[in-house]
Amino acid sequence: LCAWFAVPDGAEAGSGRRVAVLAFDADNTLVVGRSLPFTRSYPSLTVTHAQAHLFEREVWEQHGVIPEGHPWLKPVRSSAGTAPANGTFFRVDGAEVHEVAVGPIHAGIIEPGHFRFQCAGEEVLHLEIALGYQHRGVERALPGGPHRATMSQMETVSGDATIAHATAYATVLEALCGAEAPLRSQWLRALALELERLANHVGDLGGLANDVAFLPTAAACGKIRGDFLNLPDLVCGN
């Protein structure tokens, strides 16, 4: 299950269709399925397919459609006009168990997120993550487009995945139009995507080293990441 969301269908609140995107590894394909119109509630799939839990929570939060039988139904980003609000966090009981709350403001230059740890000594028993502090409603800006600002919006969805999001959006438009990008463009996209991947993976390795206070490796990875980030200048001048 790659994606699952709801599309409003009519003026009645809580009405719409569910759209799911499924990936099949056997033949490397994606399939899009759409449900019949529904209102108010539907049987939760999380009970049998755990990967659906976050999607169902988001559909409930955005459209008020209740997944009946969902084992842990609570907001993803907002509740009662306050954002974000993750509801009640999972808690582990025990005399030696302590809770650690981290974020959303962090010491490093990263996007905000709240992390709730349940620990017993040095052992982390459970981690729950609350995101969405920078949710900007990009999805709702897309209908009726593409607009002049659409590609810029795609490039700024996530700062470290500019090429990935821009390429994904371009390929969606090409598929809808029945068009195919020139071979040269496909090669340039592949090259840019690989450079972005290398920069991110090297940055992650440096982050792991920094988290365990192994600073020489962290510094080396930072330098190498900078080299990868500068290489696109040779390709497109930026």
Predicted regions and their residues:
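Terminal low-complexity/charged segments
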Residues: 1-123
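Short, conserved phosphate-binding/catalytic loop or strand-edge motifs used
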Residues: 76-78, 208, 226
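Aromatic-residue-lined binding/catalytic grooves and analogous aromatic/hydrophobic interfacial grooves
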Residues: 210-238
